[in-house]
UniProtKB/Swiss-Prot annotation:
<dbReference type="InterPro" id="IPR004396">
    <property type="entry name" value="ATPase_YchF/OLA1"/>
</dbReference>
<keyword id="KW-0460">Magnesium</keyword>
<dbReference type="GO" id="GO:0016887">
    <property type="term" value="F:ATP hydrolysis activity"/>
</dbReference>
<dbReference type="GO" id="GO:0046872">
    <property type="term" value="F:metal ion binding"/>
</dbReference>
<dbReference type="InterPro" id="IPR012675">
    <property type="entry name" value="Beta-grasp_dom_sf"/>
</dbReference>
<dbReference type="GO" id="GO:0005524">
    <property type="term" value="F:ATP binding"/>
</dbReference>
<dbReference type="Pfam" id="PF06071">
    <property type="entry name" value="YchF-GTPase_C"/>
</dbReference>
<dbReference type="InterPro" id="IPR006073">
    <property type="entry name" value="GTP-bd"/>
</dbReference>
<dbReference type="InterPro" id="IPR013029">
    <property type="entry name" value="YchF_C"/>
</dbReference>
<feature type="domain" description="TGS">
    <location>
        <begin position="278"/>
        <end position="361"/>
    </location>
</feature>
<keyword id="KW-0547">Nucleotide-binding</keyword>
<dbReference type="InterPro" id="IPR027417">
    <property type="entry name" value="P-loop_NTPase"/>
</dbReference>
<feature type="binding site">
    <location>
        <position position="36"/>
    </location>
    <ligand>
        <name>Mg(2+)</name>
    </ligand>
</feature>
<comment type="function">
    <text>ATPase that binds to both the 70S ribosome and the 50S ribosomal subunit in a nucleotide-independent manner.</text>
</comment>
<dbReference type="InterPro" id="IPR004095">
    <property type="entry name" value="TGS"/>
</dbReference>
<feature type="domain" description="OBG-type G">
    <location>
        <begin position="3"/>
        <end position="257"/>
    </location>
</feature>
<dbReference type="InterPro" id="IPR023192">
    <property type="entry name" value="TGS-like_dom_sf"/>
</dbReference>
Length: 363
């Protein structure tokens, strides 16, 4: 089960630099707009201290963490929805992601250029959000035109979708994202195939300076995003690396204090994306390996184990389940079983974060 986080923002705000440090890649991240043209993709581990503790209990030397896919998408500009700055191509890349990581520059630095000549985080957020909204309006209206042709057939499904799309367009034309529209699960299911961008969860990543006096960290930004449904925010400080042309080797020259600070920021970015997607982690554990698996919260166990192998989902019979806390407290399966802490669950069991499972199946 793959989950994609797309880095979105104006050109030259730090997307590629952040991508490099998270993925340990060295894609170009130079100080000029549209340095990135094609989207870059990298897989990053979701660091979880529970893995090491489980491995100690089962005496396993092999640990496999959960992962998230990151996509570094070229910068958007005004008019992107009409194709400005290769906008259509970039917007399609955003549609293919599961969560938007919106990077905003919030600091002054005369050595780092800005595509609009000045640093204004509020304006920059509004530019990107408006382009995404206009793109969704265009997608909805194009679909509505096609549906209108079939409207006379009195097809209930066609009329149902038309009503939902009209509701969406009305909301979008008030410059509001679809995240802030209270669509039902059924309504979302009907239009999900359109991959509407403003319906996706969002994380705002504020690229700040280590020198707080240079930060334009305006309260107005939060006034803009406060109505975003469950929008997450996180700070990063990428100007720590500017002196070395964004090469990942710049990290080696940081002091221990700044290394710890930078590592914490990177970890916060990954977990912000993880939480925005409403994901949880469950585990399989044995001497051969300890493996973390990622699934959407509130799924039945037979649905969740599909990420391990489709056969486990198709032929699911039952699962042996123990919570992480009990597994660690009682030092493994044997003592946990003696104390009645291991449960046998059927396919309608809703898997919980931290569950350690063993599945019985037959195909």
């Amino acid at each position: 089960m793959g989950f994609k986080c797309g880095f979105v923002g104006l050109p030259n705000v730090g997307k590629s630099t952040l991508f490099n440090y998270l993925t340990k890649l060295n894609i170009p991240a130079d100080n000029y707009p549209f340095c990135t043209i094609k989207s870059n993709v990298g897989i990053v581990p979701v660091l979880d201290n529970r893995l090491n503790k489980i491995a100690q209990v089962v005496c396993s030397n092999k640990i496999i963490p959960a992962t998230i896919e990151l996509v570094d998408i070229a910068g958007l500009v005004k008019g992107a929805y009409k194709g400005e700055g290769l906008g259509n191509q970039f917007l399609d890349h955003i549609r293919d992601t599961n969560v938007i990581m919106h990077i905003v520059r919030c600091f002054e630095n005369r050595y780092v250029t800005h595509i609009y000549g000045s640093v204004d985080p509020v304006r920059d957020v509004q530019i990107i959000n408006l382009e995404l909204i206009l793109s969704d309006i265009e997608v909805c209206k194009n679909r509505m035109c096609k549906l209108e042709i079939n409207k006379l057939s009195h097809n209930k499904q066609v009329n149902k979708e038309l009503l939902i799309l009209k509701k969406c367009v009305y909301h979008l034309e008030k410059s509001k994202s679809l995240r802030s529209l209270n669509l039902t699960e059924e309504e979302i299911f009907v239009i999900n195939y359109l991959r509407l961008i403003t319906l996706k969860p969002v994380v705002y990543i504020f690229n700040i300076s280590i020198d707080q006096s240079r930060n334009l960290y305006k309260r107005e930004i939060f006034d803009i995003i406060k109505n975003e449904h469950n929008a997450k925010t996180v700070n990063v400080c990428l100007d720590l690396m500017q002196s070395s042309k964004n090469d990942v080797s710049a990290y080696d020259h940081l002091s221990l204090k700044y290394k710890q600070l930078f590592n914490k920021m990177l970890k916060n970015v990954i977990w912000a994306g993880f939480n925005a997607l409403n994901l949880i982690t469950f585990f399989t554990a044995g001497k051969k390996e300890v493996h973390a698996w990622t699934t959407t919260n509130n799924l039945f166990i037979f649905q969740s184990v599909k990420c391990i192998h489709t056969d486990l989902s198709k032929g699911f019979i039952r699962a042996q389940v123990i919570s992480y806390d009990d597994f660690i407290k009682y030092k493994g399966e044997k003592r946990s079983k003696e104390l009645g802490k291991i449960r046998i669950e059927g396919k309608r069991y809703v898997i919980c974060d931290g569950d350690i499972i063993h599945v019985l199946y037959n195909v």
